[in-house]
């Protein structure tokens, strides 16, 4: 860790804090921001490896906070697809372009955001997508989560039309990605993404991540459902734009 300057430690504290905020209740846009900042210091896949232990360590607290607000029916549909996506990514990681999947996820995110905001304006009724679509979206979420820790857009594409409360939305997302991150751990090891120095560096930022969780939860409790989902849709929209822009 001696090769890191004080400025780099300060810079890396931001993604650690953003990981906590995303787990505390303000959505996956912050997790992507964490990956982007980390990629300024590490190569992208190494940045993902730096963040994964922080995600795994913070996930149990996030799940515990929202433990009474989990929509189990969606878990049963999305999780098999996510696991399939993670497994396929492990075998195909050296054969497919992460830029291409980022573009696909980006367009999906934009479509989701525009559709969601339109539904809010016209007060569209609750809509449940076919389970096959849920498995497909889960697989895309597993892929994008594996590569850039940004699995929220396809998962949100399935959950948001259900018009869940923000607490139930967060509880469901928290459990889904807690399981997803554990599933990703073994493939990351097999790909040789972890080393002793990187793990020691990551563990340094655990307190900052936990602080972010409580800050995210505090903010989540202070805003209405309307404001929360506006933040989610807006962040997903700009997240999609950014994924496309930097992948072209």
Locate each region found by the language model.
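Hydrophobic alpha-helical transmembrane segments in multi-pass integral membrane proteins
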Residues: 47, 89-92, 142-150, 184, ...
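Cytoplasmic-side transmembrane-helix entry/capping segments in multi-pass membrane proteins
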Residues: 72-82, 104-106, 128-138, 168-175, ...
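Hydrophobic/small/kink-forming positions within alpha-helical transmembrane segments
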Residues: 56, 60, 79-87, 117, ...
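Transmembrane helix exit motif
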Residues: 59-67, 104-129, 218, 238-248
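Interfacial helix-loop-helix linkers and transmembrane-helix boundary segments
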Residues: 63-77, 93-103, 123-128, 194-199, ...
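Small-residue-rich hydrophobic segments that form or flank transmembrane alpha-helices
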Residues: 9-77, 137-142, 152-206
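Interfacial loop-to-transmembrane junctions
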Residues: 169, 214-236
């Amino acid at each position: 860790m001696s090769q890191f300057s004080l400025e780099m430690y300060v810079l890396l504290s931001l993604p650690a804090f953003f990981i906590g905020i995303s787990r505390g209740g303000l959505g996956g846009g912050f997790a992507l921001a964490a990956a982007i900042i980390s990629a300024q210091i590490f190569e992208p896949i190494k940045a993902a490896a730096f963040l994964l232990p922080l995600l795994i360590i913070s996930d149990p607290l996030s799940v515990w906070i929202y433990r009474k607000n989990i929509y189990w029916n969606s878990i049963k549909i999305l999780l098999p697809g996510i696991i399939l996506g993670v497994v396929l990514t492990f075998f195909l990681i050296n054969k497919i372009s992460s830029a291409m999947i980022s573009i696909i996820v980006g367009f999906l995110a934009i479509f989701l955001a525009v559709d969601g905001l339109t539904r809010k304006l016209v007060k569209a009724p609750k809509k449940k997508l076919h389970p096959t679509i849920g498995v497909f979206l889960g697989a895309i979420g597993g892929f994008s989560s594996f590569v850039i820790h940004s699995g929220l857009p396809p998962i949100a594409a399935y959950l948001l039309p259900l018009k869940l409360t923000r607490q139930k939305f967060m509880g469901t997302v928290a459990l889904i990605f807690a399981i997803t991150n554990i599933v990703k751990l073994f493939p990351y090891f097999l790909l040789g993404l972890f080393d002793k120095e990187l793990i020691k560096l990551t563990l340094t930022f655990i307190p900052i991540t936990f602080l972010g969780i409580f800050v995210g939860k505090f903010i989540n409790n202070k805003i209405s459902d309307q404001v929360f989902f506006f933040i989610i849709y807006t962040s997903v929209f700009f997240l999609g734009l950014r994924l496309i822009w930097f992948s072209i």
